[in-house]
């Protein structure tokens, strides 16, 4: 059985890609994200697909991305790469934006849509496959 699964890897990844792409994108702040392990895909009106991520709990990750910047790589990349803000040091960590800049990141997210799907097995592989294939603007894992 294990050998058969390995033989079908390409088909499994293509199936996961198809399932994600078939989902309707939901405006960022209107999304009702499932409380499960899974994968999410973020697109922006002007920039198209900007980020693909995975999490053991995509609802919690979505909430993190919707809050302030400290724990959110997506928010940091929007701030530095798109809006060209500088990260500030606080408590010895360079992971903060000014409050006004965090508000600008929220404005950017208002122009984003998200797709999220439950993935119990293979989410790391599917995330890596999709990042390599689509090279989203804000992902850093393209060097995997």
Residue ranges of each PLM-predicted region?
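GIY-YIG nuclease catalytic motif and its immediate N-terminal context
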Residues: 1-60, 64, 90, 95, ...
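Acidic, metal/cofactor-coordinating or nucleic-acid-engaging core segments within structured domains
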Residues: 69-106, 111
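Short, intrinsically disordered, mixed-charge
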Residues: 63-68, 80-84, 132-136
């Amino acid at each position: 059985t294990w050998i058969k699964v390995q033989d079908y890897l390409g088909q499994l990844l293509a199936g996961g890609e198809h399932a994600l792409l078939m989902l309707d994108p939901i405006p960022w702040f209107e999304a009702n994200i499932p409380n499960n392990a899974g994968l999410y895909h973020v697109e922006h009106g002007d920039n198209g697909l900007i980020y693909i991520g995975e999490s053991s709990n995509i609802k919690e990750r979505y909430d993190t991305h919707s809050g302030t910047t400290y724990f959110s790589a997506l928010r940091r990349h929007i701030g530095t790469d798109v809006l060209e803000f500088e990260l500030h040091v606080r408590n010895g960590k360079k992971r903060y934006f000014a409050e006004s800049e965090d508000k600008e990141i929220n404005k950017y997210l208002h122009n984003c849509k998200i797709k999220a799907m439950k993935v119990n097995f293979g989410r790391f592989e599917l995330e890596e496959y999709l990042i390599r294939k689509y090279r989203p603007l804000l992902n850093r894992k393209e060097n995997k």
